[in-house]
């Protein structure tokens, strides 16, 4: 590999960040030791999912608390939060390549996004902009292979632990006045202190 810094891109709502996200990052750093840094990029609005609940400043503060527990280099970028309207991965990748011309990027996506990758804006262009796409497990012990996608590009599959939690589930628990598990104490304390996800 040349002198370019290999950097991961990990996007999502992170509303709130939880132990599932933590295990994905741990597995990624373990399985991809050449990667020296991950950019965690919260989106303002995913075009294929429901609109977010929390304010951008709350998301960023929760993420700062979340990544403070890692020894590896993880940087939070707010470029998608600053956009109006939906966030598109192709825009983000191209913007990052302009800002960081000496880096090579790999993308982390969930198995659900892998299944729907053909629905992403300019998905074929994304394949030309990153080195590799790593798919993490969310629900399946073994991610069903998309033969067509894998004939076009190298998708690699992480062996991350399956953590039965989503940000949507956590928000529902808070709305029902239940304090959920699978969320770090720092993030939980922040949520309770600031009355996020309360009725």
From Swiss-Prot:
Which segment of the chain is annotated as a signal peptide?
none
Record's catalysed reaction(s): nicotinate beta-D-ribonucleotide + ATP + H(+) = deamido-NAD(+) + diphosphate
**InterPro entries the record matches:** Cyt_trans-like, NadD/NMNAT, Rossmann-like_a/b/a_fold
The enzyme's E.C. designation: 2.7.7.18
Query: CDD domains from the xrefs?
Result: NMNAT (cd02165)
Molecular function terms from GO = ATP binding; nicotinate-nucleotide adenylyltransferase activity
Q: Which BP terms does GO give this entry?
A: NAD biosynthetic process
* Family annotation (Pfam families): CTP_transf_like
**Which keywords does this Swiss-Prot/TrEMBL entry list?**
ATP-binding, NAD, Nucleotide-binding, Nucleotidyltransferase, Pyridine nucleotide biosynthesis, Transferase
Query: Pathway membership of this protein?
Result: Cofactor biosynthesis; NAD(+) biosynthesis; deamido-NAD(+) from nicotinate D-ribonucleotide: step 1/1
The entry's function note states: Catalyzes the reversible adenylation of nicotinate mononucleotide (NaMN) to nicotinic acid adenine dinucleotide (NaAD).
What family classification does the UniProt entry report for this protein?
Answer: Belongs to the NadD family.
Q: What HAMAP family does the annotation carry? A: NaMN_adenylyltr
Q: What is this protein called?
A: Probable nicotinate-nucleotide adenylyltransferase
**Organism in which the protein naturally occurs:** Leptospira interrogans serogroup Icterohaemorrhagiae serovar copenhageni (strain Fiocruz L1-130)
**What is the gene called?**
nadD
